[in-house]
């Protein structure tokens, strides 16, 4: 018989750095999930993605067990890391803080395509370019 789902929980946690302190501990504790078990499993699966915040979707079952699915880092984090920018522009229409080439955009598309709502790489490239422009980074598209 399949386990009965109690609920879902979405978190963004730095890769390899999950610990019982807030926000992870309280979010899991109030649902009765073994916090240390989750932290160890999450840190093990994300140790190779250090430097990124990783979105995770936890499925919590009525017997207090859980499974989790890792997503790709947020698009703006990938854009900033690949373009070498530390922070987005405070006024993206006037102040440009960096530039992305078509090759860099396609690199981001390759990482994010499974999390986007399209399978077409050209459409995905436009989504990435739009996100880049929204934080003040020029694009070659």
UniProtKB/Swiss-Prot annotation:
Molecular function via GO: large ribosomal subunit rRNA binding; structural constituent of ribosome
GO biological process, one term: translation
Subunit composition and interactions: Part of the ribosomal stalk of the 50S ribosomal subunit. Interacts with L10 and the large rRNA to form the base of the stalk. L10 forms an elongated spine to which L12 dimers bind in a sequential fashion forming a multimeric L10(L12)X complex.
Modification(s) after translation: One or more lysine residues are methylated.
A GO cellular component annotation in the UniProt record: cytosolic large ribosomal subunit
PANTHER family referenced in this protein's UniProt entry, alphabetically: 60S RIBOSOMAL PROTEIN L12 (PTHR11661), LARGE RIBOSOMAL SUBUNIT PROTEIN UL11M (PTHR11661:SF1)
Gene name of the record: rplK
Keyword entries, A-Z: Methylation, Ribonucleoprotein, Ribosomal protein, RNA-binding, rRNA-binding
Domain of life of the organism encoding this protein: Bacteria
Family: Belongs to the universal ribosomal protein uL11 family.
Protein name from the UniProt record: Large ribosomal subunit protein uL11
SUPFAM superfamilies (alphabetical): Ribosomal L11/L12e N-terminal domain (SSF54747), Ribosomal protein L11, C-terminal domain (SSF46906)
Known role: Forms part of the ribosomal stalk which helps the ribosome interact with GTP-bound translation factors.
Cited InterPro entries: Ribosomal_uL11, Ribosomal_uL11_bac-typ, Ribosomal_uL11_C, Ribosomal_uL11_C_sf, Ribosomal_uL11_N, Ribosomal_uL11_N_sf
């Amino acid at each position: 018989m399949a386990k009965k789902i109690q609920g879902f929980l979405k978190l963004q946690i730095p890769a390899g750095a999950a610990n019982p302190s807030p926000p992870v501990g309280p979010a899991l504790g109030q649902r009765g999930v073994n916090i240390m078990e989750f932290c160890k499993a999450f840190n093990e699966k994300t140790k190779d993605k250090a430097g990124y915040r990783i979105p995770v979707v936890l499925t919590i079952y009525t017997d207090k067990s859980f499974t989790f699915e890792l997503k790709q880092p947020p698009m703006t984090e990938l854009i900033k890391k690949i373009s070498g920018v530390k922070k987005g522009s405070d006024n993206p229409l006037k102040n440009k803080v960096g530039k992305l080439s078509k090759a860099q955009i396609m690199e981001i598309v390759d990482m994010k395509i499974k999390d986007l709502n399209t399978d077409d790489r050209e459409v995905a490239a436009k989504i990435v370019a739009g996100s880049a422009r929204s934080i003040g980074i020029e694009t070659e598209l």
